[in-house]
């Protein structure tokens, strides 16, 4: 009798595990700082509906597989070559080209001491402010960012000031929540604002998680979905999941390919 009961229980456990590893992020941005296991099938990250944007391949460094199973990214700038080694980025990972892009352009980096990019880690709001500032070519501003939880001696204060001054990010209830994790939808909203909130065409009819998109984020997600910034080919783009570093890298590379790097 016990053996008969054990079989369906084991089947259910296997199904649960399969469902857990299919996504590339936590289902809620408040659940933690790491993303779940991602799919290891390489996709062409340049293959999207955009045909009029920039060719961001010109931004890429030379990426080669290393003995650890990771990659070495060699970037040439001002006649000098610098090689970045990441043991946690497989050469055939769906985000490998995107990591190459953000590292080559200086928008993102990893832990050079441990040789880790940490692609599955979540991105804090303060970290995203720094990333977008670099990506868009932000410049220092004299404006203050007045939030109850934001001191002017924080390392990210100047970046947050610029983001807030440009209307790209804001707070909630007078607080900025710098250490809070950004969701996929929130990251997309910021980039939509950076793009100047272009007129939206298309629908979310074929987006699997459309019912989970907030009303305030609907235009941004519709824009991202219909312009190929997010697809279901590489991983799950669940609106409320904590966006991962790999996903941010991919968003930025596709944004650049679509309309170029620009300041708000």
Locate predicted features:
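Sec-dependent N-terminal signal peptides of Gram-positive bacterial secreted proteins and lipoproteins
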Residues: 4-26
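Feature responds to low-complexity, polar/acidic, surface-exposed segments characteristic
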Residues: 6, 26-96, 109-129, 133-157, ...
């Amino acid at each position: 009798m016990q053996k008969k009961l054990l079989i369906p229980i084991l089947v259910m456990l296997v199904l649960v595990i399969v469902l857990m590893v299919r996504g590339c992020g936590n289902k809620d941005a408040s659940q933690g700082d790491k993303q779940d296991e991602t799919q290891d099938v390489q996709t062409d990250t340049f293959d999207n509906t955009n045909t009029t944007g920039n060719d961001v391949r010109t931004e890429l460094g030379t990426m080669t597989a290393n003995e650890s199973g990771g990659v070495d990214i060699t970037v040439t700038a001002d006649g000098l070559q610098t090689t970045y080694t990441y043991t946690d980025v497989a050469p055939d990972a769906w985000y490998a080209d995107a990591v190459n892009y953000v590292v080559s352009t200086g928008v993102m980096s990893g832990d050079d001491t441990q040789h880790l990019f940490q692609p599955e880690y979540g991105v804090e709001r303060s970290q995203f402010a720094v990333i977008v500032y670099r990506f868009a070519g932000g410049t220092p501003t004299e404006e203050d960012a007045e939030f109850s939880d934001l001191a002017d001696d924080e390392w990210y204060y100047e970046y947050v000031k610029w983001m807030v001054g440009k209307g790209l990010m804001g707070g909630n209830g007078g607080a900025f929540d710098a250490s809070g994790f950004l969701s996929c939808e929130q990251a997309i909203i910021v980039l939509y604002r950076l793009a100047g909130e272009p007129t939206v065409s298309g629908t979310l009819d074929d987006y699997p998680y459309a019912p989970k998109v907030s009303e305030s984020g609907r235009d941004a997600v519709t824009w991202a979905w219909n312009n190929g910034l997010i697809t279901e080919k590489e991983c799950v783009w669940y609106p409320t999941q904590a966006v991962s570093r790999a996903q941010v890298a991919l968003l930025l590379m596709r944004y650049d390919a679509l309309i170029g790097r620009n300041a708000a």
